[in-house]
Amino acid sequence: MALKALDYDTLNENVKKCQYAVRGELYLRASELQKEGKKIIFTNVGNPHALGQKPLTFPRQVVALCQAPFLLDDPNVGMLFPADAIARAKHYLSLTSGGLGAYSDSRGLPGVRKEVAEFIQRRDGYPSDPELIFLTDGASKGVMQILNCVIRGNGDGILVPVPQYPLYSATISLLGGTLVPYYLDESENWGLDVANLRQSVAQARSQGITVRAMVIINPGNPTGQCLSEANIREILKFCYNEKLVLLGDEVYQQNIYQDERPFISSKKVLMEMGSPFSKEVQLVSFHTVSKGYWGECGQRGGYFEMTNLPPRVVEEIYKVASIALSPNVSAQIFMGLMVNPPKPGDISYDQFARESKGILESLRRRARLMTDGFNSCKNVVCNFTEGAMYSFPQIRLPTGALQAAKQAGKVPDVFYCLKLLEATGISTVPGSGFGQKEGVFHLRTTILPAEDEMPEIMDSFKKFNDEFMTQYDNNFGYSKM
């Protein structure tokens, strides 16, 4: 048969190289089992509403009115919606050129970008320029836009933390770049060692790779740690000395579960460092409506802010953004509402504060329940989830399991996670999908299942793990820590 213009053999090699473990083999098998009638608990993706988190009322009211502006003319609208939601809907509609169905500026609505800049200034105490803020279809799209500008070919390297969120490895592969790993220290609660960074850069350069940028994920995904101010300062100095663009993935900044180490933005630390750092270090920071107590993953709202990028570079990024014409307009309004929520004295404030506080307090309790649950299991060790939405326990696998995985043609942690899925319906992501040190195995699960279901889920995991360890324990030891 004649070769088709597009088949697997003629596919772009970069497409074939890119992998995204969060929706990989485990997810596909979980979907098959669900179709067969098995109850599946999808803890593989940070997707709060899919696991029962209720949407915040106020933003849904505002966007509902924006989607159906004829309701604003209904004489009964004041009986169905609070006055502040009505006022905000009118405000956002006034920013558009024809409602939510009309394209916006390719950078996003100027009025919403102004709200984002004001939010950043309140958070950090330093000015923010709306002209250097682009609204995007989720933070992921923004990350892809910036990496597309940084990566010129496979000779360009991006420093990425390992374990890492596979958005980065997949996008770098897709764009034809080279991922340069730097390993986080699990024994130090996934801390970052600058000496390790220097070693990673030196090794990459010895192989002819030009390291162009560095990624930090704060709070961490999948590792759940919060970077200290001192650590961020070290990173910024490192980027200054090595002339690297810093990409600050800060999408989990609302998800903080301990008081000792609050979220501090890279922009704030950079500005506090003063000249020459504050004038020279190039920083792009990302945020989203998908995480925190909003959890509006399906809305696809995000932004990035650029610091110290030359005007001509910003113009080129704008040009490329213009190819897609406009980010999702309703998502832009969600972003405006996230950075400018109801304030004390507003009609909707009490309900908004009650709902958001309730979600965060429940997430904090669930983080503790899951950490304690994992640490009660045989051959499982888990650092406390300081932030984000995930637990990342290490599983010490018996040598019998390593042998069985090899015979099955599976990576050991994939083998374990598949067995867990088949036995319990819990769909996780194997640590190998995020990168890990050789011979060490993990899995990632979200802390998002309903709080009242968490004890049963952890009991189910413990029962499976005990049986797995017994079945494959051949008295020849376990994988290393």
Swiss-Prot record:
Q: Which GO terms describe its biological process?
A: glycine biosynthetic process; L-alanine catabolic process; photorespiration; response to hypoxia
Tissue expression as described in the entry: Mostly expressed in leaves, and, to a lower extent, in shoots, stems, flowers, seedlings and green siliques.
Keywords, alphabetical = Aminotransferase, Peroxisome, Pyridoxal phosphate, Transferase
Q: Where in the cell is it found?
A: Peroxisome
> Quick check: keyword Transferase in the entry?
yes
As recorded in UniProt, its EC number(s) are: 2.6.1.4, 2.6.1.2, 2.6.1.44, 2.6.1.-
Q: Does the keyword Transferase apply?
A: yes
> What did gene disruption experiments reveal?
Reduced growth. Loss of alanine aminotransferase activity and increased light sensitivity alleviated by addition of sucrose and rescued by high CO(2). Higher H(2)O(2) levels in light conditions. Greater root growth in low water potential and upon NaCl-stress.
Tell me, using the record's free text, what induces this protein. Down regulated in the dark. Slightly induced upon low-oxygen stress in shoots.
Pathway, per record: Amino-acid biosynthesis; glycine biosynthesis; glycine from glyoxylate: step 1/1; Photosynthesis; C4 acid pathway; Amino-acid degradation; L-alanine degradation via transaminase pathway; pyruvate from L-alanine: step 1/1
Kindly give the PANTHER family that the UniProt entry links to this protein: ALANINE AMINOTRANSFERASE, GLUTAMATE--GLYOXYLATE AMINOTRANSFERASE 1
Name the job this protein performs: Catalyzes the glutamate:glyoxylate (GGT or GGAT), alanine:glyoxylate (AGT), alanine:2-oxoglutarate (AKT) and glutamate:pyruvate (GPT) aminotransferase reactions in peroxisomes. Required for abscisic acid (ABA)- and stress-mediated responses in an H(2)O(2)-dependent manner. Functions as a photorespiratory aminotransferase that modulates amino acid content during photorespiration (GGAT activity); promotes serine, glycine and citrulline metabolism in response to light.
* Name assigned to this protein: Glutamate--glyoxylate aminotransferase 1
